[in-house]
Regions:
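Transmembrane core module of solute transporters
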Residues: 1-140, 252-257
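Hydrophobic transmembrane architecture of multi-pass small-molecule transporters
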Residues: 145-248, 254-257
Length: 257
């Protein structure tokens, strides 16, 4: 472990690329996860999802020049990285508490934190990765570095989708154990649904059973999405703790001996 820390201090490129990889997970992964919740749980259309998520774009638009100014004034990029990833972690932690009733206002703060945090990371992460790289290595290093963000997004999306499906299956199995014949709560809920759907006549029982199955699946989906948000919270916190370990890059840009 000590050797890894010394290596990170000696050369920021590997650590900066790791930051960029995780940034890709946060940038593309969260862009995927929020619409999944809004579409599958809330039943939103594409337009409604866009109207709900535009807050993040606005925050990024206004935060971009502020982040640039902070870099110009000599703010330590390691601090900006730590604050940015911590902000992402706080936002995903809040999102991990979501329920099936969450709407625009409940998602507002997590989205604001996401927009601000992403812009606090995007500029410093490049400076951190390439600021200590020798000039003769910059051409190859910059190309490889730019790849890491897209790679992080691709891998992140695959892992998020896999984890989401596995947790959905797990929660469905657990909820199905609770919604069975002989359980008073389940039978009471089904009886209420049958009463509400009496207008279906002889098909009321079948319609109520289908409705109950949909409710169970919706709740399992919410729980699975919350689990993924919690996993992302841990990831962002761990990467934030790594920020103070790297060397402070040259304020003048890439270069070194």
């Amino acid at each position: 472990m000590r050797r890894l820390l010394l290596l990170a201090r000696a050369d920021n490129f590997a650590t900066g690329s790791l930051f960029s990889f995780v940034l890709g997970v946060g940038l593309y992964g969260l862009t995927y996860l929020y619409p999944v919740y809004l579409a599958r749980v809330r039943g939103y259309s594409a337009l409604q999802i866009g109207e709900t998520m535009f807050v993040t774009g606005i925050c990024m638009f206004f935060m971009a020049p502020i982040s640039g100014k902070l870099m110009q004034r000599g703010v330590d990029p390691r601090i900006m990285l730590a604050v940015g990833f911590t902000g992402l972690a706080v936002g995903t932690y809040q999102a991990s508490l979501l329920t099936s009733d969450w709407d625009f206002y409940e998602l507002l703060v997590p989205q604001i934190l996401r927009g601000i945090s992403l812009m606090l990371i995007m500029i410093p992460v490049t400076t951190t990765a390439l600021g200590t790289t020798p000039p003769w290595k910059l051409k190859n290093a910059s190309g490889l570095f730019n790849l890491t963000r897209n790679l992080g997004g691709a891998v992140g999306l695959a892992l998020i989708n896999t984890l989401l499906n596995k947790r959905l299956d797990l929660h469905l199995a657990r909820l199905h154990e609770q919604v069975t014949w002989g359980r008073a709560a389940a039978e009471e809920a089904l009886a209420k649904l049958i009463e509400k759907m009496a207008h279906f006549g002889s098909d009321a029982s079948l319609a109520a059973t289908r409705k109950l199955a949909l409710l169970v699946r919706k709740q399992a989906t919410v729980m699975a999405i919350a689990d993924v948000f919690w996993g992302l919270t841990i990831l962002f916190l761990l990467i934030a703790l790594l920020a103070p370990v790297v060397r402070r890059p040259n304020p003048q840009g890439g270069g070194g001996d």
